Amino acid sequence: MILELDCGNSFIKWRVIHVADAVIEGGGIVDSDQALVAEVAALASVRLTGCRIVSVRSEEETDALCALIAQAFAVQAKVAHPVREMAGVRNGYDDYQRLGMDRWLAALGAFHLAKGACLVIDLGTAAKADFVSADGEHLGGYICPGMPLMRSQLRTHTRRIRYDDASAERALSSLSPGRSTVEAVERGCVLMLQGFAYTQLEQARVLWGEEFTVFLTGGDAPLVRAALPQARVVPDLVFVGLAMACPLD
């Protein structure tokens, strides 16, 4: 079995899959390396034969995680690294090594699934969009604050905005104008995300008309799902690209 890790800015997304058929044995989201080891170790009758990682962390942090995995599970982790071209997709950055690996692998996965032009909208700590043409050219993309960052900035820099996570969840029962601060903030942030997504869709239409596929991924993808009914929601899109970048037998 293979352990796959997507190490983001705030959390680690993980899953364990069978090598032969990619059936998922277990998975989750954790906020620390130690919590990751504990959750994977808790899976009954799982014996890891490999590990592959995509990380936007520093090299030192990623190396420390690899060492911890080697110690805990006796497997060597394979880390995805930037390349100029892979699987028919050409990296669109002037300095290809500067493109975030999460964005690069999501683009690889999307192009593989779409078999043509595609728009990837990834809504996590940051909101990201990337465009890949029908011939595999990565045309670039956009990054802006995601829901967690928008919410955090308002809570941190506005003294009278204080509420808990349960209140935030209840506030999203609709998107009508808020009648409390929590409703106004949460619904306003969702509308910002939806506006970001709509704008990317219009950019794609200018480029390709209607001949493209939209992919939604990331933890907050459900917040814009209803606004983009034509989109394919692929929660593990980065893992699709990771399997291509780091093949394991």
From Swiss-Prot:
Keyword set includes Ligase: no
Catalytic EC class: transferase
Active-site residues annotated for this sequence: 102
Binding site for K(+): 122
Pathway: Cofactor biosynthesis; coenzyme A biosynthesis; CoA from (R)-pantothenate: step 1/5
Primary localisation category: cytoplasm
TM ranges: none
Domain of life (superkingdom): Bacteria
Binding site for substrate: 93, 100-103, 181
HAMAP family associated with the record: Pantothen_kinase_3
Protein name: Type III pantothenate kinase
